[in-house]
Amino acid sequence: GVAWAANKLGQKSVVFMPKGSTEYRRKQIENEGATVTIEDFNYDECVRLATKKSKEVPNGVVVQDTAWEGYEEIPNWIMQGYGTMAMETANQLEADNCKVPTHVFVQAGVGSLAGSVVGYFTNLYSNVAKKPKLIVVEAAAAACLYKGAVADDGKPRIVEGDLETIMAGLACGEPNTVSWDILRNHADVFVSAPDWVARLG
């Protein structure tokens, strides 16, 4: 998305991908005009690298969906975009005569997509008697949201290390601080899924 948008706007983009990323994905992003490298870092370390590198160039901007103190505006915009996908899903459900689903499952890495989906459906179904169960699913190797939910003290948790999983896009060990607030208050269930679950589809 970032490389595509930068290309359309005539801007330069640099993408740091975490180890375990495929050469195919790297090439697809590069085809959008970005400078792309696969680093020997996990996802969260790549975010820190991108943040550092953005400060070394004039007008450098980090475009990232994970938030931390002092970096919330762009992640909020991205989460609003994810909310559009939730709205489109709700419209399709209604078109198929499904007034209220029984369950909504959403994947999570840093939790931005999950926070948007959970927030959207919490609001949409706030006045119905039987609300859907909102279920957040993470890769077991990077289950930071799950660990925060299990701790049950309202604080986010960080998972460190290689975060090795076949669920490459979900190998994130540090939660988005904005979405964590939504998830801890509105998600019904957090699931830590091992790779064999993803293999089964």
Model-inferred region functions:
Residues 10-25, 103, 124-141:
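Short, acidic/small-residue loops that bind anionic groups at enzyme active sites
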Residues 9-13, 32-34, 56-60, 99-102, ...:
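Short coil/turn connectors at secondary-structure junctions
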Residues 2-9, 114-125, 132:
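Short Gly/Thr/Asp-enriched flexible loops that form oxyanion-binding sites at enzyme active sites
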Residues 1-53, 145-158, 179:
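Active-site-proximal loop->helix
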Residues 44-47, 51, 55, 59, ...:
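Active-site/ligand-binding loops adjacent to catalytic centers
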Residues 6, 29, 89, 104-105, ...:
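Buried hydrophobic positions in well-ordered alpha/beta secondary-structure cores of metabolic enzymes
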Residues 14-18, 39, 63-64, 74-78, ...:
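Glycine- and other small-residue-rich loops at beta-strand/loop junctions that grip anionic moieties
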Residues 57-125, 181-184, 192-201:
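Active-site/ligand-binding-proximal alpha/beta "capping" segment
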